[in-house]
C-alpha cells in the first residue's frame, strides 16, 4: 500500500537476543545488510504484517518471539532518485515504517531464511545493539537511528554480559 504522499506502508523488525545483540541480515546475493522489513498488505494491521514478514524472511512465528515495543510514530525515509520506479503507478518515493522490537524466545536454530517463496536474505549474525545504525545503507540511517534510540532502554535489559569474540556469519 502506498499512501497519498507516495510512501509505501511498511514494518521494520528489530530482533534482540538475551545478550543485548540484534539480528542483522545479509541481503540475498548482495553485500548489504539490514533488519527484516516488508510492506503492509491491504486490510492488514502493522502487527499482522510484522508476523507475516517475520515468517517469510526469517522463518520465525508468533510463538518464537515476544513483542517488547512498537514505535510511537511512523518513521519515513526517501529512496534515492535512482531507486524510484518512476513508471509505477502510484509512484513510491520511500517507505513509511512502523517498527517493532522483538525478543527472541526460542533457540536460534528456529531461524530459517528459506521459508518464503523468494529468500530476502542469505546470511545473518548477531551484532552489538548500535552496530546497524553505522552500517546500514545511508538513506535508511536516520530511520534506524530513531528506531534504535526509541527502543534502547527496552532492549538493554536483555543484555546479560558483553560477549567476547568475533561476530560469526550464519547461513540460513
UniProtKB/Swiss-Prot annotation:
Instruction: Give the InterPro entries listed for this entry.
Output: Nudix_hydrolase (IPR020476), NUDIX_hydrolase-like_dom_sf (IPR015797), NUDIX_hydrolase_CS (IPR020084), NUDIX_hydrolase_dom (IPR000086), RppH (IPR022927)
Q: Which family does it belong to?
A: Belongs to the Nudix hydrolase family. RppH subfamily.
User: What cofactor(s) does the depicted protein rely on?
Assistant: a divalent metal cation
Q: Any idea what this protein is called?
A: RNA pyrophosphohydrolase
Q: Where are the coiled-coil regions?
A: none
Q: Which organism is it from?
A: Vibrio atlanticus (strain LGP32)
Per the UniProt entry, the Enzyme Commission number(s) are: 3.6.1.-
Q: Does the keyword Transport apply?
A: no
Summarize the protein's role. Answer: Accelerates the degradation of transcripts by removing pyrophosphate from the 5'-end of triphosphorylated RNA, leading to a more labile monophosphorylated state that can stimulate subsequent ribonuclease cleavage.
**GO cellular component assignments:** cytoplasm
> What is the enzyme's main class?
hydrolase
Motif Nudix box at which residues? 38-59
What are the entry keywords? Hydrolase
Q: Which Gene Ontology molecular function entries are recorded, alphabetically?
A: mRNA 5'-diphosphatase activity
According to the entry, every stretch annotated as the Nudix hydrolase domain falls at 6-149
Q: Which domain of life is it from?
A: Bacteria
Record flagged with keyword Glycosyltransferase: no
